[in-house]
């Protein structure tokens, strides 16, 4: 499992909430990428590569299935296209900004020195929190539509492994208080979103559609990785694109991979 930007894999505060333990209880072997919170795609891919090699050594498996959230999906794609195509069986991305963000394009119109200063300050903070090679400016840049377009040219979708993507969205500015300011901004420039990433940008390879919750909240960028450690609602879904708890979603994704022979 490969986390997104701004967080790290920690032993006592799991990025993925309840999800890993439930998957393990269902028989899955779960491991993590351990990449930096704000590392560049290239730098983080190197770290993930070391983690992947260790997983193969421990398990004796020939390949791994990658489930990646947000920017972690870009790092997983980069890894596949740079020496690890024979060690990856499938890549599943969840709310990954495959096509960048017009919102970030707008924000990056600020004076470059100002963006650089903000990035450097963020680097110092994340260095204190444990990042080995923080590079916030590279993180900002990969989210622009221009850089994302070039990234997609340089890292084409593999045609010999299973590649799929899933999307989720909020239903309004107050779907999640964490994203009450970012949701309307992204909505203005990019349309429907999860508070951070537009549903259009989430589309990649075999896109499985956009899901939301059974209530007025919808599902945010944080909800997707079970940040609150609880189900969204007890209300039973009334449509195929609705879910009431994120954990069963992951169980079904892994179950689907197993049924396909992965």
Please identify what each model-predicted range represents.
Residues 3, 45-148, 194:
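Serine-dependent carboxylesterase/thioesterase catalytic core
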Residues 1-64:
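Active-site catalytic motif of lipid deacylating hydrolases and related acyltransferases
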Residues 31, 92, 164-166:
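Hydrophobic/aromatic beta-strand patches that form the interior of the parallel beta-sheet core
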Residues 156-262:
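C-terminal catalytic-base region of ester-bond hydrolases, centering on the histidine
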Residues 13, 102-107, 174-179:
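Short aromatic-enriched loop/helix-cap "lid" or pocket-rim segments at secondary-structure transitions
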Residues 130-175:
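A conserved mid-domain beta-alpha-beta active-site/ligand-binding segment of alpha/beta enzyme cores
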Residues 5-8, 36-39, 71-74, 96-100, ...:
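Solvent-exposed loop/turn segments at secondary-structure junctions
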Residues 9-14, 109, 236-238:
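Short, flexible/disordered intra-domain loops and linkers
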